A protein has these predicted regions:
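C-terminal alpha-helical cap/extension of soluble enzyme domains
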Residues: 65-67, 76-170
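Single conserved hydrophobic/aromatic residue that forms the stacking wall/gate
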Residues: 1-7, 11
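Short, well-ordered coil/turn segments that N-cap beta-strands
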Residues: 5, 43-46, 90
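Active-site beta-loop-alpha junctions enriched in small/polar residues
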Residues: 13-17, 50-56, 75, 95-97
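Conserved, mostly hydrophobic/aromatic
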Residues: 8, 50, 84
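Alpha-helix-loop-beta-strand connector modules within alpha/beta enzyme cores
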Residues: 27-49, 62-63
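Active-site-adjacent beta->alpha loops and helix N-cap segments on the catalytic face
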Residues: 24-33, 54-58, 81, 101
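Active-site-proximal beta-alpha loop/turn segments in soluble metabolic enzymes
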Residues: 9-25, 58-59
């Protein structure tokens, strides 16, 4: 059976949100070799990378160029996340990147069109940026095109499957 484990120990200094690292992370900060060692010992264990937003520079710039005051910060490089995926990581949290995409575009509209008050005029470009970001991550993380493999079940059906031990590793 596959199990899921969080990897708080992989970050030698774990942090969440936008302010993860004050410099581009390397082996002194990210212990990706730990993920690889875990995967070799227990290859059917699914791993989780909490707080793995990449905190893209272009989104920091979008926010700051439109009135924001984000201090320079660095996230988990997408290349390192891809490396983790090759070693059993199956869940990656990128919420901060999504929030940065939304915030950057809200700020841009507010700066460029200060008379604008219709939230749809803010939400549409913000949502488009987040969609672009997520599509990139789906491609890079190898998940694009797999939706048809997902069997849709109701919450009650899932609860019954769990209680009967019917769920199988795919």
């Amino acid at each position: 059976k596959a199990e899921s484990r969080g990897l708080g120990d992989v970050y030698k200094r774990q942090s969440h949100g936008a302010y993860k690292f004050s410099r581009k992370p390397d082996g002194d900060i990210l212990a990706m070799d730990v993920i690889e060692k875990i995967h070799k010992k227990i290859p059917k264990t699914h791993l989780v990378m909490h707080g793995s937003s990449s905190v893209p520079q272009y989104l920091q710039d979008l926010i700051n160029n439109n009135g924001g005051e984000m201090s320079q910060t660095y996230g988990v490089p997408v290349e390192e996340i891809e490396r983790g995926i090759k070693s059993g990581v199956r869940k990656i949290n990128i919420d901060t990147d999504c929030r940065m995409a939304i915030t950057g575009h809200y700020r841009k509209i507010a700066r460029e069109k200060p008379a604008e008050f219709d939230p749809r005029k803010f939400a549409i470009p913000a949502s488009e940026e987040m969609e672009k970001l997520c599509a990139d991550r789906f491609e890079r993380f190898g998940t694009a095109g797999h939706a048809k493999k997902i069997l849709v079940k109701s919450l009650d059906q899932m609860a019954q499957s769990y209680s009967k031990g019917e769920l199988k590793q795919i």
